[in-house]
């Protein structure tokens, strides 16, 4: 689909969606997402020009179906996949990618750190119709034999260019963590929990020099502009526990990310901001407001946040609670957490669990925001339940297979797909049936209402 769109623009001096938006041009990608979001193409264009909305769509990922991330759009979710040094398998990551798309993740990040990273990424992008993001520092370190002291700006830029050529649509860049922030880490309970952030800290400690992503930021922007790679400005100092939430280190980095946002916009590079982390429920709204103020309303992309530190094995639930609140208060995309968080590498089933938890959170956020039409599917589900239309209920559920599977555990025969009860209440105790029998006699209800009024009048 995008091949023809990209081909027509191949000779343009700048090829980013932000560049076209600033020129007053509505691209085919903007028209496409406008239809999906049920918004006007002009609103999409103006939001991109303003920096409040992005369409991550590398010019080389021509099979990609454009999508929008921003406060004007529906709340999106990202699924993280990727190999590790302990477990790496190209086919396994492709399977996770397929699961991510089947359960309707909006984007995916390949966070591979083990195996042939280029081959894994190539296979993931080839199998994907959604934007793919990466954290380039993982491959940069991999390519220098995991020796942080051998990391150079030249290697860093070469890896970024290579990934951009492959079709990566957004990079997480840890450019906001500066030398001046290092002393603030000492006050923390858990220090640095971001892998990229910890690697940058190790590099700065080794060389006693400024963060190379910050030093080479202009060169990074040039690469992004050539391929229309959006920047996801990473939160190296996100809190990894409730005790560290909203501290000076986190907010100091956020301020720098705001400055980097303006520099990216000057070069027509699209930007979103990454956020925490582990945050108590009562601090989430404040975190969303601070991001908007410090980062000029660029889309906020949050990991959770997890609202408790003791949910090991259930962190997809703990974090989805925080994600729903964050989405309600303005986050544009939610990065999923799986049940394996803090415990191990997720498998395909963990990916499914994480996606569904976060689809629930994002949908709840859209309803809370009062987004037009967000609740329509919920109302349709309510109608199907009240009519005992089981097959329609399965179709409307975020995880249709799971809904059908649970119903079939106790009532597997097809005849029960027409039954006016489930195994919870049975035919005699179903509140729907009891209510329907009452509602079928409106005259009796009116008679009761008259009697109540008469009693009240006599009592007065």
Curated annotation (Swiss-Prot):
It catalyses: 5-amino-1-(5-phospho-beta-D-ribosyl)imidazole + S-adenosyl-L-methionine = 4-amino-2-methyl-5-(phosphooxymethyl)pyrimidine + CO + 5'-deoxyadenosine + formate + L-methionine + 3 H(+). Its EC number is 4.1.99.17. It comes from the Bacteria. Zn(2+) binds at residues 278, 342. Pathway: Cofactor biosynthesis; thiamine diphosphate biosynthesis. Keywords: 4Fe-4S, Iron, Iron-sulfur, Lyase, Metal-binding, S-adenosyl-L-methionine, Thiamine biosynthesis, Zinc. [4Fe-4S] cluster binds at residues 422, 425, 430. One of its GO terms (molecular function) is 4 iron, 4 sulfur cluster binding. Binds 1 [4Fe-4S] cluster per subunit. The cluster is coordinated with 3 cysteines and an exchangeable S-adenosyl-L-methionine. The keyword Zinc applies. Its cofactor is [4Fe-4S] cluster. GO terms for cellular component: cytosol. Substrate binds at residues 80, 109, 138, 174, 194-196, 235-238, 274, 301. GO terms for biological process: thiamine biosynthetic process; thiamine diphosphate biosynthetic process. Belongs to the ThiC family. Homodimer. Catalyzes the synthesis of the hydroxymethylpyrimidine phosphate (HMP-P) moiety of thiamine from aminoimidazole ribotide (AIR) in a radical S-adenosyl-L-methionine (SAM)-dependent reaction. This is Phosphomethylpyrimidine synthase. It comes from Sulfurimonas denitrificans (strain ATCC 33889 / DSM 1251). The lineage of its organism: Bacteria, Pseudomonadati, Campylobacterota, Epsilonproteobacteria, Campylobacterales.
């Amino acid at each position: 689909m995008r091949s023809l769109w990209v081909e027509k623009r191949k000779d343009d001096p700048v090829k980013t969606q932000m560049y076209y938006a600033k020129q007053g041009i509505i691209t085919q990608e903007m028209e496409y997402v406008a239809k999906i979001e049920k918004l006007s193409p002009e609103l999409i264009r103006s939001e991109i020009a303003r920096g409040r909305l992005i369409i991550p769509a590398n010019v080389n990922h021509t099979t990609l179906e454009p999508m929008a991330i921003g406060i004007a759009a529906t709340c999106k979710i990202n699924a993280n996949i990727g190999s590790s040094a302990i477990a790496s398998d190209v086919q396994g990551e492709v399977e996770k990618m397929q699961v991510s798309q089947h359960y309707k993740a909006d984007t995916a990040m390949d966070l591979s750190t083990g195996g042939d990273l280029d081959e894994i990424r190539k296979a993931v992008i080839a199998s994907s119709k959604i934007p793919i993001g990466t954290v380039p520092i993982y491959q940069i370190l991999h390519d220098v034999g995991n020796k942080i002291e051998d990391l150079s700006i030249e290697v860093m830029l070469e890896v970024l260019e290579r990934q951009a050529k492959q079709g990566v649509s957004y990079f997480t860049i840890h450019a906001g963590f500066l030398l001046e922030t290092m002393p603030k880490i000492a006050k923390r309970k858990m220090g640095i929990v971001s892998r990229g952030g910890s690697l940058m800290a190790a590099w700065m400690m080794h060389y006693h020099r400024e963060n190379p992503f910050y030093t080479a930021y202009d060169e990074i922007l040039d690469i992004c502009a050539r391929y229309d790679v959006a920047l996801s400005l990473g939160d190296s100092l996100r809190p990894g526990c409730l005790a560290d939430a909203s501290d000076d280190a986190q907010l100091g980095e956020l301020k720098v990310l705001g400055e980097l946002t303006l520099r990216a916009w000057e070069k027509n590079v699209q930007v979103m901001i990454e956020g925490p982390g582990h945050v108590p429920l009562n601090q989430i709204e404040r975190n969303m407001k601070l991001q908007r103020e410090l980062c000029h309303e660029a889309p906020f992309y949050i990991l959770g946040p997890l609202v408790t530190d003791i949910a090991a094995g259930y962190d997809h639930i703990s974090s989805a609670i925080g994600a729903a609140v964050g989405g309600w208060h303005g986050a544009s995309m939610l990065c999923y957490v799986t049940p394996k968080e803090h415990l191990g590498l997720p498998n395909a089933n963990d990916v499914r669990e994480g996606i569904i938890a976060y689809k629930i959170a994002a949908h709840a956020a859209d309803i809370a925001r009062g987004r037009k039409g967000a609740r329509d599917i919920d109302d349709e589900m309510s109608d199907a339940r009240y009519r005992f239309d089981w097959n329609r209920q399965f179709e409307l559920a975020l995880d249709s297979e799971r809904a059908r599977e649970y119903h079939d555990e106790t009532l597997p025969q097809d005849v029960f797909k027409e039954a006016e009860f489930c195994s919870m209440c049975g035919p005699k105790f179903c509140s729907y049936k009891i209510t329907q029998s009452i509602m079928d006699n409106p005259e009796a209800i009116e008679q009761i209402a008259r009697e109540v009024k008469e009693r009240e009048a006599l009592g007065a």
